Amino acid sequence: MADENSGRHERRSQRDRSESTQRRVLDATLRCIGEQGYVAVSLQDIAEMAGVSRGAITHHYPSKIDLTAAAIQHFVQWRYERVNAAFAGKDSIELRERLDILWGEFQAIFPITFELIVALRADKDLLALYRRNAKGRIEEITTGYDDFFPELSGMKVSGVVIAVMAAFYRGAYIESVARDPAYIEEMRAVFQDMLAAYLAADRKTA
């Protein structure tokens, strides 16, 4: 019995170490892509960032495409968890305040988001693998954002509205590279007004 328990503990420890290594590798992949861009990053760059050997990476992810596809899924889940933590205990705040929180979170991680979008656009094999691996997972996580915006409850297009929010914030961040910050704030205010008006009109017709 002692040997059996010892064996189980060893298997769990090996599994825990393997999962920990994979998380470090995926985190390092995202950091490297965010800093250097997908095309410029090599597996060796990622290995050095993660503090592991190149072989430790290829043991789990045979190619850069396999690794990046897994890293994108990891990023989507991590982003959702980050936003979820930011909204913790803030259920009763106004819509505009919640939109400000979402903007702040998306803005903080946009460099990675942007580089991942560029990677998916540039590498058709990566895009195909990512779509196969993701399946309904992305839609599932996107649907979770509804919890932060109860105003969307019952809407047939709630997922679309969330996607519109995310698309606007991505676009606003790109604009912020060359635009005056005051102009970006004006854009955000107009968007919030438009969204509030749309939601109010939807409630009236419901």
Put a short name on every predicted segment:
Residues 66, 70, 77, 81-110, ...:
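Hydrophobic alpha-helical connector segments
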Residues 1-9, 139, 168, 174-206:
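C-terminal peripheral helix-coil segments that are non-catalytic and often amphipathic
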